[in-house]
Structure formats: structure tokens, C-alpha cells
């Protein structure tokens, strides 16, 4: 069973940056797509981007280009998402979700409140 464990809640100031982690257990980072999404209060899910084992570069949602950085450390089965130049509207719960290639989402993190 795929399980994702995210880092804890963050209290940050406007203009600063936040970096959160997502550690996977139950499978190894060999063939996957790891997504980051967020949910602001009263809003639906919003995609930030994803990283794939089949590509050398992450894919970022256009809205967050230049502010978001997604990386993965395959040696520790951990993915990271950093969001910079934070604004009040970035207040949300941030989730990671993994899809093993050719399957639906196999696991979700519990969320990180920012």
C-alpha cells in the first residue's frame, strides 16, 4: 500500500518562502508522477505542478511559474515543494499525491497547512 507522509504545518510571513516534504512508503520512486495540489479555504483543488520519473524536468502550472520548485530525492523516496514570494492568498492546505505510471492516484498525503 502506498502511503505519503507530509511535513507539518508552517507559519510563514508574506514575501517569504516555504518548503514542504512528502515521503513515500510502500513503493520506490522508480516509475511515478508526484503531484502537488492545494485547497484554499472554501475553494476547490488547485494544481501547482508535478514531477515525473520519465522527465528530467518538473512540470509547473502556469499560474505558479517562477514561484514553485518541485524536486524529488529518489534515494530517500521523498519529494519536495517550495513556494516563494508568499502572499495571503497562498494560505491553503497543500497535498501531495502520487500516481504510479498507468494507474490512478495510488496515495495522498495528509496535507500541510500554510
UniProtKB/Swiss-Prot annotation:
The keyword Cell cycle does not apply. Residues 1-106 form the Ig-like domain. Keywords: Adaptive immunity, Immunity, Immunoglobulin. One of its GO terms (biological process) is immunoglobulin mediated immune response. One of its GO terms (cellular component) is immunoglobulin complex. GO terms for molecular function: antigen binding. Transmembrane segments: none annotated. Disulfide bonds: none annotated. The keyword tRNA-binding does not apply. Antibody isolated from ten mice was exclusively of the IgG1 subclass. There was no heterogeneity in the heavy chain V region sequence. This is Ig heavy chain V region.
Amino acid at each position: 500500500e502506498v502511503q505519503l507522509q507530509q511535513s507539518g504545518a508552517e507559519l510563514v510571513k508574506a514575501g517569504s518562502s516555504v518548503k514542504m516534504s512528502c515521503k513515500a512508503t510502500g513503493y520506490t520512486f522508480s516509475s511515478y508522477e508526484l503531484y502537488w495540489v492545494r485547497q484554499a479555504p472554501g475553494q476547490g483543488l488547485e494544481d501547482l505542478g508535478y514531477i515525473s520519473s520519465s522527465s528530467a524536468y518538473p512540470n509547473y502550472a502556469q499560474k505558479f511559474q517562477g514561484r514553485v520548485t518541485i524536486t524529488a530525492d529518489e534515494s530517500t523516496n521523498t519529494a519536495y515543494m517550495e513556494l516563494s514570494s508568499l502572499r495571503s492568498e497562498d494560505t491553503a492546505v497543500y497535498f501531495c499525491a502520487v500516481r504510479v505510471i498507468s494507474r490512478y492516484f495510488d496515495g495522498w498525503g495528509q496535507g500541510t497547512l500554510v
